[in-house]
């Protein structure tokens, strides 16, 4: 009889567990442009507050210094309810993110 109550309590606890709101997230906007072989851009937004956009281009085409240059941003709502945003550049100098919540290099 005790085991029945323990099992019943476990089942009730599992049924009462909060659902993951991100599990039901859907893409609400998607845009992409890849028509030019030396340039691309795309952006995505989801129903749970995630947003991402990026554009990239090949610079110094045909030269010894040819390199990819990428600019983008992303944002998401953290578990604390705060929206975190990051803007970044990625090029021959590496990945360079900036955001209010990120430390600044000296």
From Swiss-Prot:
Key words of the record: Cuticle, Signal
Residues forming coiled coils: none
Keyword flag Lipid biosynthesis: no
PANTHER family: ADULT CUTICLE PROTEIN 65AA-RELATED, CUTICLE PROTEIN
Protein name: Cuticle protein CP14.6
Function: Component of the cuticle of tobacco hornworm.
InterPro entries per the UniProt record, alphabetical: CHIT_BIND_RR_consensus, Cuticle_Struct_Prot, Insect_cuticle
Gene from which the chain derives: CP14.6
Pfam families: Chitin_bind_4 (PF00379)
Spans traversing the lipid bilayer: none
Every Chitin-binding type R&R domain range: 37-106
Secretion signal, residue range per the UniProt entry: 1-16
Gene Ontology MF terms in the entry: structural constituent of chitin-based larval cuticle
GO CC field: chitin-based extracellular matrix
Organism, as annotated: Manduca sexta (Tobacco hawkmoth)
């Amino acid at each position: 009889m005790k085991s029945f109550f323990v099992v019943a309590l476990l089942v009730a606890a599992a049924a009462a567990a909060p659902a993951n709101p991100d599990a039901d997230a859907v893409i609400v906007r998607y845009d992409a442009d890849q028509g030019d072989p030396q340039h691309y851009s795309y952006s995505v937004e989801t129903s749970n507050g995630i947003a991402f956009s990026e554009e990239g281009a090949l610079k110094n085409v045909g030269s010894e210094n040819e390199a990819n240059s990428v600019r983008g941003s992303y944002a998401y709502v953290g578990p604390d309810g705060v929206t975190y945003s990051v803007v970044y550049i990625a090029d021959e100098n590496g990945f360079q993110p900036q955001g209010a919540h990120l430390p600044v290099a000296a």
